[in-house]
């Protein structure tokens, strides 16, 4: 009986020893900061450039003094004249688009480009602006533009130009202003039902039509030596202002 108990005790101790196994090696703790993998690659890591703090009260546009020569040179290059004029015009217009009161016809603008391209020293921007009674900014924009319309675009452009002239002269006819022959042939100002046109009545010329140019061109006389007036035969002819009044009567 004692042998049976001894065997049971020995068997129990053996089973208990199997169930309460202690690990031989200590458990590995997880890494708090895992190390990046090292491998070969052609790509270079971007280096972090530390920004240099600028002292207080220093303007980046101020001159930088050369440490070797002791001379100062501008940090920012000088702006061209056209950029200064563009900024001044933008401030003058108050952010609105460029929309001059006086607009030149497409043929006139093409003639301005032709004059400047053939003789740029003679037909400068101030000379063209004075002759065509527009601002130098308008001449500069015309000369800067290199856009050329196609045949279809040219026809549509001329059609819009004719409609614009017809609308303007129709409004002037209502004010008693006589339209030019070109617009009269197109039917502008034509009376209906046998009535007399408004520009032929006693209410004619009640509105003083002035040019949209500035007052600087009030006493303007075209210079025939710069741009001569040519007649139908292709020969130069004197302007009316150069002919004495006694010869014109």
Swiss-Prot record:
The keyword Transit peptide applies. GO terms for cellular component: mitochondrion; nucleus. Keywords: Mitochondrion, Transit peptide. The keyword Transit peptide applies. Residues 238-249 have a biased composition (Polar residues). This is Required for respiratory growth protein 9, mitochondrial. It is found in: Mitochondrion. Required for respiratory activity and maintenance and expression of the mitochondrial genome. Residues 1-39 form a transit peptide. Residues 44-53 have a biased composition (Basic and acidic residues). The gene is rrg9. Residues 44-75, 227-249 are annotated as: Disordered. Transmembrane segments: none annotated. It holds the Pfam family Neugrin. Belongs to the RRG9 family.
